[in-house]
């Protein structure tokens, strides 16, 4: 079937819109779909997403499409950019409308709610084995990407041809560098765990612990991410790249991160509901914390930072008490014998 668009993006929030703008700025005809018809009508009229990316005009190659069937019929390349807790339900909606030659990539960062499963497992459960799958991950703030500021990400998938095609679609010498990666599991995991650690970094700064504590938390958070990744068969080297260290540093150190700002509010004494309300958008790390904690427990992987953040978010522990417990842990070598 012939494409009338180069790619369809599902999800018209800040990140989905930013990726659609970036693709269209490359000269690729891009369709953007969202679940709210009123919001989509506003985007079409304004030629801008004033709610999430005010003042950034849509390129001519970006078209708004409120009809999911038409959006999915237009292209075999489908980029899903929705919160992790609705990822499965969006795929369920899309399934009967997908073309037989469809190829599915997502930029959603997270795990399945309650179970902590990777999104590739959710996608396979919903869609079966017939479609190539891929994931985009890396240090990307939506506003900077949409503005065309230099950014780098990684892509990995089940089909090398699809991965290479995505690199060609996304890569732009002026705005976006894209690295191919063969670690499908590692890229998915990095995007979820970094959200958890970013909440911890925000809490540390909110308490007033300073740069030393923040840096220690990021470093040990990377250790936890790598430990969990290796238990799932991921390549440890992945976590020194864009989807690991890169995304972790970005999210933990810049207040554009909702997860970091959420942690800051908690560290300054806000309760969970008040802190979420202050952000005003989805804080992926709130759910990710429970998902990552569940996964680590199931695999028997020690993740003390994640465990303390879980206790703050879901068991009412104060951030100060969580910090005290981490600091009072048994002394151990930084590089334990293998």
Curated annotation (Swiss-Prot):
What PROSITE patterns does this protein's entry cite?
Answer: NAD_G3PDH
Nucleotide-binding found in the keyword field: yes
| E.C. no | 1.1.1.94
Q: Which GO terms describe its cellular component?
A: cytosol
**InterPro entries tied to this protein:** 6-PGluconate_DH-like_C_sf (IPR008927), 6PGD_dom2 (IPR013328), G3P_DH_NAD-dep (IPR006168), G3P_DH_NAD-dep_C (IPR006109), G3P_DH_NAD-dep_N (IPR011128), NAD(P)-bd_dom_sf (IPR036291)
Superkingdom, taxonomy of origin: Bacteria
Pathway of action: Membrane lipid metabolism; glycerophospholipid metabolism
Task: Give the residues the record marks as binding sn-glycerol 3-phosphate.
Answer: 109, 138, 140, 194, 247, 257-259
Q: Which GO terms describe its molecular function?
A: glycerol-3-phosphate dehydrogenase [NAD(P)+] activity; NAD binding
What is its subcellular localisation?
Answer: Cytoplasm
Q: Which UniProt keywords apply?
A: Cytoplasm, Lipid biosynthesis, Lipid metabolism, NAD, NADP, Nucleotide-binding, Oxidoreductase, Phospholipid biosynthesis, Phospholipid metabolism
Q: PANTHER family of this UniProt entry?
A: GLYCEROL-3-PHOSPHATE DEHYDROGENASE, GLYCEROL-3-PHOSPHATE DEHYDROGENASE [NAD(+)] 2, CHLOROPLASTIC
Annotated family: Belongs to the NAD-dependent glycerol-3-phosphate dehydrogenase family.
HAMAP family of this UniProt entry? Answer: NAD_Glyc3P_dehydrog
Function noted in UniProt: Catalyzes the reduction of the glycolytic intermediate dihydroxyacetone phosphate (DHAP) to sn-glycerol 3-phosphate (G3P), the key precursor for phospholipid synthesis.
Query: What NCBIfam families does this protein's entry cite?
Result: PRK00094.1-1, PRK00094.1-2, PRK00094.1-4
Name of the protein described by the UniProt record? Glycerol-3-phosphate dehydrogenase [NAD(P)+]
Task: Please state the gene responsible for encoding this protein.
Answer: gpsA
